[in-house]
Amino acid sequence: MQTPKNKLVIIPTYNEIENVERIIRAVSGLEGGYHILIIDDGSPDGTAAVVKSLQPEFEDRLFLIERSGKLGLGTAYITGFKWALDKGYDYVFEMDADFSHDPADLPRLLAACEDGGADFAIGSRYADGVSVVNWPIGRIIMSYYASVYTRTVLRTKIMDSTAGFLCYSRRVLEGIKIGRA
């Protein structure tokens, strides 16, 4: 039986007022009790206010870290990873707020780690053809060919190296020694 704090989805935001409530509801609606950590980089559009208004409804499952200014995606994930480790989560997910990743695929990523024995799983927008929403064609082409290039140069089987849709086991995050030189 899984512990209640088993799974955390980290969703960095900046000006995601149009998406943030929908993504929270989509992730919260999944079976398995996924917790959500929104890390907002001082969105001037009120993204953080929307999250705060939803916290009473999703008590003990929806968390918010507000940062002042646009500090970037990488530092948002590092902040989230540290928070997740401090709170005792076993599996930590990266996910965008703009629905470029389907929340319904979170259980598949989890299964790769939890049931499949992987310490790290990457979701792909290209494994079964292109699956992105509201992206300009230039961004789709650039992302696709960046992944092809990465597969070729590094000789890996990673289908979507720019996905940003990942699941990490606690063991991997602890091994990385996040935030240490």
What spans do the regions from the language model cover?
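Acidic helix N-cap motif at the loop->helix transition within catalytic regions
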Residues: E18-R22, D45-L54
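Residue-level signature of catalytic and energy-coupling elements of molecular machines
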Residues: V20, V27, G80, D98, ...
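Short beta-strand/loop segment that forms part of the nucleotide-sugar
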Residues: G33-S43, I65-E66, M95
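A conserved acidic beta->alpha catalytic loop
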Residues: D40-A49, F99
